[in-house]
């Protein structure tokens, strides 16, 4: 594999900085989209194995999820269609660091997709002196996904290796914990289930952009965020939210969707408009995070702006009751 396709980053620094490949390591392997509760259990197991083996713990993953390389072709009207990503790469790295992971080995999926499964363990050994692996029960690798978790564990079962760890299926709320189940919950308007499986609320973080200032004229000024390309957009509708601003944490009411009452364009771009309850400052150009806590109602088109104003007032009142202080 060409070195141009590879980067090692220390997670002990903020922001993460490039480092040389470690001489010895235990590696956690997976896509880790969303870094949900099962992922975090895997990462903690990797950190324990690495500490017992006297070496650093790293994560081997891709710049972009492998699913990105097998996309369905969108229809023309899907220019702003929802993606599948549950978090950004920077959010993913921060969550790795929270669990005590020392470094991440990022590579391009295209650089390894055709490597035979039998050659993959040697790639890990030569790449960073990998002496132990930790993965989930359903981990696949190698060309065509021919390699299994059991095969990888067998390849790292030499006496000189740190014992391999394969984590079994984790179940929660009557089902398997998985990124695909979290996506399904968000698309169906169930942020509570998504949060239970993730261990945190689904969120959107970004720089507030200027809108049409209609919310201000209605008496409910909003902070507007766009979903990055590839990011999963939850079910369109109104949410009770918790909003993290540079000036503190506030309850909020967020509309995710296309603003049908005021936007008559053929293919409007979905966004997130949040009325921050109890906040009176200016957030334009500042970074905020919106946690989606409770789905209140579907997005709808109102007959006039007075009806829209009344609905926002009701939504804000309900959100203020639901969003408790941290």
Locate predicted features.
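N-terminal Rossmann-like or analogous alpha/beta NTP/dinucleotide-binding catalytic cores
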Residues: 65-159
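Positively charged, low-complexity intrinsically disordered leader regions
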Residues: 1-29
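Phosphate/ribose-recognition catalytic cores of enzymes acting on nucleotide-derived substrates
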Residues: 211-326
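Di-metal (Zn2+ and/or Mg2+/Mn2+) metal-binding site signature of metallo-dependent hydrolases
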Residues: 28-47
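Glycine-rich, Lys/Arg-enriched anion-binding loops that position phosphate/diphosphate groups
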Residues: 157-258
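ATP-dependent adenylation/pyrophosphate-handling site
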Residues: 22, 26-29, 47-74, 79-80
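Surface-exposed amphipathic alpha-helices with a cationic face
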Residues: 43-51, 153, 157
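Residue-level signal for inorganic ion chemistry
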Residues: 36, 96, 133, 194, ...
């Amino acid at each position: 594999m060409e070195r141009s396709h590879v980067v090692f980053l220390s997670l002990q620094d903020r922001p993460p900085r490039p480092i040389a490949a470690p001489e010895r390591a235990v590696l956690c392997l997976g896509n880790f989209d969303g870094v949900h509760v099962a992922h975090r259990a895997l990462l903690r197991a990797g950190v324990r194995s690495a500490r017992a083996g006297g070496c650093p713990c790293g994560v081997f993953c891709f710049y972009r999820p492998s699913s990105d390389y097998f996309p369905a072709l969108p229809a023309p009207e899907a220019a702003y269609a929802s993606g599948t990503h549950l978090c950004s790469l920077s959010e993913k790295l921060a969550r790795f660091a929270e669990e005590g992971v020392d470094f991440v080995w990022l590579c391009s999926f295209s650089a390894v997709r055709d490597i035979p499964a039998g050659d993959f363990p040697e790639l890990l050994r030569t790449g960073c002196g990998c002496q132990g692996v930790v993965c989930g029960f359903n981990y696949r690798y190698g060309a065509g996904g021919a390699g299994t978790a059991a095969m990888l564990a067998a390849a790292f079962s030499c006496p000189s290796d740190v014992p391999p760890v394969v984590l079994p299926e984790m179940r929660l709320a009557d089902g398997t914990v998985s990124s695909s189940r979290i996506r399904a919950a968000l698309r169906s308007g169930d942020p509570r289930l998504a949060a239970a499986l993730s261990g945190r609320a689904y969120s959107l973080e970004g720089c507030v952009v200027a809108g049409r200032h209609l919310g201000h004229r209605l008496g409910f000024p909003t902070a507007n965020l766009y979903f990055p390309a590839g990011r999963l957009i939850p079910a369109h509708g109104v949410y009770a939210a918790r909003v993290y601003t540079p000036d503190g944490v506030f309850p909020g009411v967020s509309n995710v969707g296309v603003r049908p009452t005021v936007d008559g364009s053929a293919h409007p771009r979905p966004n997130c408009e949040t009325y921050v309850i109890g906040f009176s400052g200016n957030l334009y150009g500042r970074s905020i995070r919106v946690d989606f806590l409770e789905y209140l109602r579907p997005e709808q088109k109102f007959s006039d702006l007075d009806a829209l104003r009344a609905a926002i007032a009701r939504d804000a009142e309900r959100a203020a009751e639901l969003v408790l202080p941290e």
